[in-house]
């Protein structure tokens, strides 16, 4: 399900591929990891680099052809869905740390 929204911060075409930088809602920052998974407008993708609340997506031609990503522009709002396994891991670790008095 949709967890938050993000804003397309940059869009760079390189040959037939495209790299997007997405400014993520603060509520999602703890779930963003390089090579982790996220869905953008229902499209499941692998996260590239992550820095200061911005994550990068390196989109191959086939994905651009089969989805609406190629039409996204800077400033567009996108729906973010965090991978459920990532959520489970992060929230379990947080709970265990809290139970042990580690903040």
Give the ranges of each region predicted by the language model.
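Conserved loop->alpha-helix
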Residues: 1-103
């Amino acid at each position: 399900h949709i967890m938050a929204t993000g804003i397309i911060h940059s869009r760079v075409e390189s040959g037939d591929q495209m790299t997007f930088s997405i400014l993520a809602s603060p509520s999602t920052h703890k779930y963003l990891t390089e090579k982790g998974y996220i869905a953008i407008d229902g499209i499941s993708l692998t996260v590239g680099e992550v820095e200061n609340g911005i994550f990068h997506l390196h989109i191959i031609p086939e994905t651009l052809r089969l989805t609406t990503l190629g039409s996204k522009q800077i400033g567009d709002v996108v729906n973010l869905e965090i991978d459920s396994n990532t959520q489970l891991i992060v929230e379990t670790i947080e709970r265990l740390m809290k139970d042990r008095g580690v903040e």
